[in-house]
Amino acid sequence: MKLIKGILFSFFVFSLSSASWARQALTYDIYRLAVQSESRLERDIKRDETRHPREVLAFFEVEQGQRVLDLFSGGGYYSELLSYVVGGKGEVIAHNNQAYLPFAKEDLDERSYAVRLPNVTPLLSEANDLELAADSFDRIFYILGFHDIYYRDETWPEIDDNKLVANLFRSLKPGGIVAIIDHDAVVGAGKETAQEFHRLSSEHVINKMTQAGFVLNDSADLLKNEADPLTISVFDKAIRGKTSRYMLKFIKPLAN
């Protein structure tokens, strides 16, 4: 009898493990299908080599049916990938402000959300004017833009960092994830690197996010580039498109 119980227990554990593995494999396959979609733009595919989108989507646990905010989405590289993953029952809000549009125009014209990606809703708003419903997003992607909070220029409206991050916290569902990727700077460097190099040390992001109530759940070195000196502009020809970038996964704690 003990032998039979042992066999049954082992089979039960094996079945659970197999089911868990199968779910993980199926989920990861969703990311592969998104990246390999024949509908993707050629300009996006050329960027994949240094961006590793399949691994990024997996790291931030994007799933079917989710509602995702792509904050300062630019030309929409991630908005399109997210739209494939969340599917018809999900939605992607592709946000930009007015200053982004001239730089993203060529990409956005070809992206043609209304025709190609009906589950993507463009949102044009300055950061300080964002109106986001409470607990309305499962994921928030903030890719290569956090440093712009501390950038100052006559063509770039000043951003209230506390107001923006508090807005993100309020609009994210409990248990939801904020995905942040940005150009790294030298450890200990001040926020002035955002102005000078369009970079920001991860410590500033972590401090600002945790002060607002987020919890840093994980980080990854997937996009790290040891050849990046971290002390030149991200637009320098020597490093453009190949900067060393950090990946930070923040979670909004579940309500008590």
Language-model features: where?
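Core SAM-dependent methyltransferase catalytic element
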Residues: 212, 227-256
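A short glycine-rich, Lys/Arg-flanked "PGG" loop and its adjoining helix->strand segment in the class I
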Residues: 83-84, 155-174
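Glycine-rich SAM-binding Motif I of class I
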Residues: 76-80
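S-adenosyl-L-methionine
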Residues: 104-130
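Short glycine-dipeptide loop
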Residues: 65, 88-90, 172-178
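Class I SAM-dependent methyltransferase Rossmann-like catalytic core
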Residues: 30-59, 63
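A short acidic, Gly/Pro-enriched loop at the edge of an enzyme's catalytic core
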Residues: 130-140, 144
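Conserved class I S-adenosyl-L-methionine
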Residues: 65-74
